[in-house]
C-alpha cells in the first residue's frame, strides 16, 4: 500500500485493489493521470466545498476511468459547487457508507464539511479535511465569552469556543475508534504561533501509526516538519514530505 503526495491536502492512496484520491485541488507535476490509467476501482473524496479541497475537474475523470465512485461532503452540493447527480455518495457528519472494498465514516470539522475515516484492506486511515484548532495562537490572550478581531481571517473570532468545538469533534471521532494506521492532518504555518497545537492535541488522544502533514503549501515543506518533534516523543512515524509526487510505502 502506498501514499503519494499530490499538492496541499491531496493524496493518493493505492492499495492492492483500489485507488483513493483525497481533496484534489491542483496537480502541478502531473502525478494523478497515471493513476487514472490503472485497472483498479477509483474512489474520489472531497471533504468540503473550499476551492483548495474541491475542484470540479474531478468529474472529467469519468471519461478516463470506467470504475469510479465519488464520495463527497454534502456541503459541496449545498454551496452549489456540484450537482446532485455528480456524486455517487453524499455524506454529512455522522454519515457512513461501505462496499466490498472499503468502509467510510464522515466525521465533523471546525470549518466546512467533514473529515474522513476510511478502512480498507486492513488499514484505518484518517483525512482531516479542514478539521484543526485554527485559532490556537490567539488562545493566550483570549477571555471566555469574548471575541478577538483577526486581521488575517478578517472576522471576529472566539478562540476558546473554537478550541472547545475542535476538542468536541475529537471526542466524536473517539466514539468510532481510538487508533489509526495513517493520519493526514493540517500543519499550516500561516496561522502563526501554536500552529502545531491541533496536531499535538490529536496525537494525545489517538494511537497513530504514521502522521502525515498537509495544508502547508503556503508556509512550505519545512514548516510542516516542526510537528516531527512531537510525533518523535510519542514514537509515531512522521513523513517529512519534500516534494509533490513523493510516494511512501505504508
What do the PLM-derived regions correspond to, one by one?
Residues 70-125, 237-247:
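Metallo-beta-lactamase
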Residues 6, 10-49, 53-61, 131-176:
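Pre-active-site segment of Zn-dependent metallo-hydrolases
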Residues 1-2, 100-102, 179-180:
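Beta-propeller blade-edge signature
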Residues 21-25, 40-54, 70-75, 126-130, ...:
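Active-site neighborhood of phospho(di)ester-bond hydrolases with catalytic His/Asp-centered motifs
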Residues 39-40, 102, 178, 206:
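Structured loop/turn residues at beta-strand edges in well-structured enzyme cores
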Residues 33-97:
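Active-site HxH/HxHxD metal-binding segment of metal-dependent hydrolases
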Residues 4-8, 81-98, 174, 191, ...:
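Binuclear metal-ion centers of metallo-dependent hydrolases, dominated by the metallo-beta-lactamase
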Residues 27-31, 49-54, 77-80, 95-97, ...:
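Active-site environment of divalent metal-dependent phosphoester hydrolases
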